[in-house]
Amino acid sequence: MPPKTPDRRNAAMQSLRALVGVVLIWGHPVASFGAEVRETEGNLIFYSTSNTADTKAVTDSFKRLYPKVDVQFERTTDSQLMEKILNEARAGKPRWDVVSTTGYYGYLLKKRGLLAAYDSPERKHFRAGFKDPQAFWTSTYTTYAVFGYNTKTVPTSAVPRSHEDLLKPAWKGQVGIEGRGYEWFTATISGMGREKGVSYMRALAAQNPGLRIGRTLLAQLVAAGEFNGTLTAYIHNFDALKNAGAPVDWVALPPSFANLHPVALNAKAPHPNLGKLFIDFMLSQKGQEVVRSLKRIPDRIDTPPDPPNLIQGIIPAFTAPEVYDNFERYIKLFQEIFGVH
């Protein structure tokens, strides 16, 4: 091979510098390499069930890193989003590239073959239980159901430390429950063990809890004193009220229902490479810091929540796949136990 001329050496060095520069972009060698190629694909379509403000914050942060990418998002409820995705699939015209939803609907999308496996290099920073073993989804943040209570009506000495404490006579008629809290119900039963869990739910129903629709509403009713406490609202529901001066606080009763929020790639994504790049961002430390800034609890192990000890000691309860396989049966069991018609 003939020796390289100075011009050829300079060209080689410039190529090397360019490659190194690409690799160093926000510390992400795989996602950053080839980003220019991916940016030429066009629009990225993101379907989300998070609220509009949170979804916009995430997509805006991504666009600041990749200004050539036009990200369009559509936000709706879990059930409406599922119907939309299924209708598109039946018509053979899927529009979306990436979806962010909750655990049960992520499971359904995978089961119906609508997701593509994508083992993002960022997934190594997520614990088992927070990512699909076959790489079809990874959870970006988790909402934990805790027991929130009114600090004016519940003295410190009476704050429950276990689920069983709520079976005491003093709590009869004083607890609010989400009227469609099916995943809380199934995950708690899974966490306790089926026999013990179902027995507990029947005993809890005998305490005459008040059923309401909406976790935010339940937290507000606790703050107003309509209930002394509620089992099914999330940490952020109570922290928002507490920070606004409401007389509420919360405690985690093990096991605590962990509501995952998986992000996944469409099996027939119009722009699969852009979709992968967006997922890489959402799972990256930078993306997870955006999640944290929205007062959510990131699932990435090196991105602690704010404050860092927020979920210290919480024992998460996930809904087992075999439970999802029989989810309709558990819905009927919930309705039977709590008298929902």
Model-derived regions, located:
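Periplasmic-binding protein-like
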Residues: 128, 143, 171-180, 202-205, 209-212, 281-304, ...
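Short beta-strand->loop
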Residues: 115-122, 136-138, 242-257, 266-268, ...
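Extracytoplasmic ligand-binding site segments that recognize negatively charged/polar headgroups
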Residues: 45-57, 72-82, 94-226
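An extracytoplasmic/periplasmic, membrane-proximal ligand-sensing/linker region
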Residues: 197, 299-341
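A ligand-binding cleft/hinge motif common to bilobed small-molecule-binding domains
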Residues: 105-108, 228-247
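A bilobed periplasmic-binding-protein/Venus flytrap-type ligand-binding module shared by bacterial periplasmic
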Residues: 146-153, 189-191, 259-274, 290-291
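Immediate post-signal peptide segment of exported/extracytoplasmic ligand-binding proteins
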Residues: 34-45, 64, 168-172
